[in-house]
């Protein structure tokens, strides 16, 4: 009797994106804190083309809850705590954070699919995004990496046809 192999081969390919059902919230929604949530809402719209959906202010005059649409996805953000340190600010005072930030990959961050990667890249660069990698091609697909105004990391992929 021939013994079956339990070894599996994993084929790498560009990540596939499945659209959310109409009128349904995405299954996963990243939630990010910002020192200045209002500035973040405006900057993310300008640099990355996200669309502001919700802006709720807290009694302290800070952003209590914000929502931005990115394609059929959603990103939530807030700036409730006055002593919160953004990744960028944290790197200024912490050697471990500075060491981590020298790694160009996205260790903690958000992956976003876009229709036109070249146009998106130019827009982000013109708005002052910190570009961590120019547009790269090859497995797992066309992509680039960037940081926003407060040092949060973003990974942008071009949508596949089909």
Question: Language model features by range: what are they?
Answer:
Residues 2-32, 41-42, 48-149, 156-162:
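Vicinal oxygen chelate
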Residues 34-36:
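Conserved beta-strand-loop-alpha-helix junction that forms the acyl-donor binding cleft
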């Amino acid at each position: 009797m021939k013994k079956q192999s339990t070894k599996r081969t994993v084929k790498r390919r560009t990540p596939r994106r499945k659209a959310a059902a109409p009128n349904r919230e995405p299954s996963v929604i990243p939630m990010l804190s910002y020192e200045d949530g209002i500035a973040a809402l405006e900057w993310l719209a300008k640099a990355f083309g996200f669309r502001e959906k919700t802006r709720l202010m807290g009694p302290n005059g800070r952003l209590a809850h914000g929502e931005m649409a990115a394609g059929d996805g959603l990103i939530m953000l807030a700036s409730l705590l006055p002593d919160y340190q953004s990744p960028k600010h944290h790197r200024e005072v912490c050697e471990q954070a500075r060491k981590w930030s020298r790694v160009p990959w996205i260790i903690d961050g958000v992956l976003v699919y876009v229709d036109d990667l070249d146009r998106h890249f130019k827009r982000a660069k013109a708005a002052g995004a910190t570009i961590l990698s120019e547009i790269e091609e090859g497995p797992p697909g066309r992509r680039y990496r960037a940081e926003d105004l407060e040092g949060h990391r973003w990974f942008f992929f071009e949508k596949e046809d089909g």
